[in-house]
Amino acid sequence: MSLVDRVLFDHIAIALPRMADATPFLCAELGGEPDAGQPSGVFTWGTYRFEGGGSIEIMEPVGPSGFLHRFLAERGAGIHHVTFKVPSLAEACARAESAGYDIIGRDESDPEWKEAFLHPKQALGIVVQFAEPGPPHAGSRPMVPPQGLPGAPPPVTIRGLRMRGQSVERAVTQWTTALQGTVAEGPRGELVFSWRGSPMRLAVEIDPVQNEGPIAIELASRRRLSLPLGPHPVLGTVFREEEM
């Protein structure tokens, strides 16, 4: 039985060589609160929660080789995927396949976290994870949240992710047909996709000639922030502030 009754945009995941290197920015600057985490085969992960419920996951490679090692070797630190919790993994995969997507990495071996993925070559330049969360059981491993920071400032609000896509039709098919979001036009003509009950949304700028993929994590704050102008030198990701 899934723990969710509708599709929810759950978190944005960033790949990093060392999870601890995220703490000075995510906690000391953005006020992120350690939430959950676990080792998971060839990587370990930890999530930070922000005002309103937005979540950022940091993934650190473990061992000599694996998919995350390859990602970091080819691209460096940066946004790796977005995760959507779904009531039924089977139904989510069927919707995506009906819309023309290939399902990769489907794994239903863990009743607490059944998952499958869309490849970035088909999915607007980003890995998309479907996850059906189930209730914990007697053999559940304890959560190990990432390192926090005593005395961290109040958390900012993570508004969501801004992306670039080459086609309105493909963006709408991906985020509404396959993932059941709703779409509206943003103030600068971008497509804004949202999910009822989700604290974050996706904004997609349409440009038929530019490469598809993530542009920036968008956030809002009631206090003054010090954000780098370009990609963060450690997290390899642009963080862009919006008005509250």
Placement of each model-derived feature along the sequence:
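N-terminal beta-strand motif that seeds the catalytic metal site of vicinal oxygen chelate
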Residues: 1-23, 77-84, 133-173, 217
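Vicinal oxygen chelate
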Residues: 2-3, 56, 93-160, 184-210, ...
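Long, hydrophobic/aromatic-enriched structural stretches that serve as scaffold segments
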Residues: 56-67, 76-87
